[in-house]
Amino acid sequence: MSSHPPAPRKHVTIHELRRMKESGERIAMVTAYDATAARLVAVAGVDAVLVGDSLGMAVQGHESTLPVTLDQMVYHSAMVRRGLARGDGRAHLVTDMSFGSYQASADEAVKAAMRLVAEGGAEAVKLEGGAEFGEVIRRIVRAGVPVMGHIGLTPQSVHKMGGYVVQGKDSEKAQQILRDARALEAAGCYALVLECIPSELARIVTSQLRIPTIGIGAGPHCDGQVLVLNDLLGLDASFTPRFVKRFGEVGAAVQDAVGAYVGEVKARAFPDDAHSFHSSSVRLVPVERHAEAAEEEPPDAIGAPI
């Protein structure tokens, strides 16, 4: 039996993702929004982490992703980068470009993408939209930033689409999604998210592209899958999209744990002796002296804030 420790797993790059597609190895991707979650998913063995603008709904409590700002994406991306470094450092980090950060002009898009890399620690950025963003993608890629595309249901266009509904169900719309996929590959995207499209369409798109496809609500035929971490953990029992499988009931576990804590505090059972500090050399001040000292304090001295 060898005494040598196992070799560290290689960092997942855009080239490794392409190799995984070519070899048939599925890509496992999840979202993360802070350092703690990033460390946990890294240790669990994910191939890629997405700092999604879904944080607007999953973390900030908004009803859509639209209010999320570029500054917030930079902030959360930097946290996730630090968390991944505390894990095994293997996962590929992609950060969403927020609504309004790339739609107005290619110049603004390049500047926003560079911020996400330089300040947020991202290795790549993801943006939503089809062939109409081809020039924006080309400009970002020429600036040295890899781009992951995103077509199908694009949450930043929720009002245009009339809600969060499956896309590409009729022949004409399916053909448009296929045309968009080819255009994004030609523009330089290294991977493509397919969201909420029929499984049959996702299979065709995946077979016709050289770049990896990563599905969410797009069936089993994509080269990889991505889920919102909060959804797969079951953090919100009231919100479970049809395409989500809950791999845990963490929300219920959190409620049980906090409920137990509240109960023990109310019952004066916590903290007990095992969770308290002791010292035999502490010099106690008599109550009388403490009261006299308090009377001598200036009337506006109310103590240090907590």
From Swiss-Prot:
Protein family: Belongs to the PanB family.
GO aspect biological process, one term: pantothenate biosynthetic process
Statement: the UniProt record of this protein carries the keyword Cytoplasm: yes
Cofactor note: Binds 1 Mg(2+) ion per subunit.
Residues that hold 3-methyl-2-oxobutanoate according to the record: D53, S54, D96, K126
Cofactors named for this entry: Mg(2+)
InterPro entries recorded: Pantoate_hydroxy_MeTrfase, Pyrv/PenolPyrv_kinase-like_dom, Pyrv_kinase-like_dom_sf
Residues at the catalytic site: E195 (proton acceptor)
Keyword NAD: no
Subunit structure and binding partners: Homodecamer; pentamer of dimers.
EC number: 2.1.2.11
Origin superkingdom: Bacteria
Any single GO CC term annotated in Swiss-Prot or TrEMBL for this entry: cytoplasm
UniProt catalytic activity: 3-methyl-2-oxobutanoate + (6R)-5,10-methylene-5,6,7,8-tetrahydrofolate + H2O = 2-dehydropantoate + (6S)-5,6,7,8-tetrahydrofolate
Pathway annotation: Cofactor biosynthesis; (R)-pantothenate biosynthesis; (R)-pantoate from 3-methyl-2-oxobutanoate: step 1/2
Classification of source organism: Bacteria, Pseudomonadati, Myxococcota, Myxococcia, Myxococcales
Record keywords: Cytoplasm, Magnesium, Metal-binding, Pantothenate biosynthesis, Transferase
A Pfam family the protein falls into: Pantoate_transf
Cellular location(s): Cytoplasm
SUPFAM superfamilies membership: Phosphoenolpyruvate/pyruvate domain
Organism: Anaeromyxobacter dehalogenans (strain 2CP-1 / ATCC BAA-258)
EC category name: transferase
Name this protein carries in UniProt: 3-methyl-2-oxobutanoate hydroxymethyltransferase
Binding-site residues for Mg(2+), renumbered to this chain: D53, D96, E128
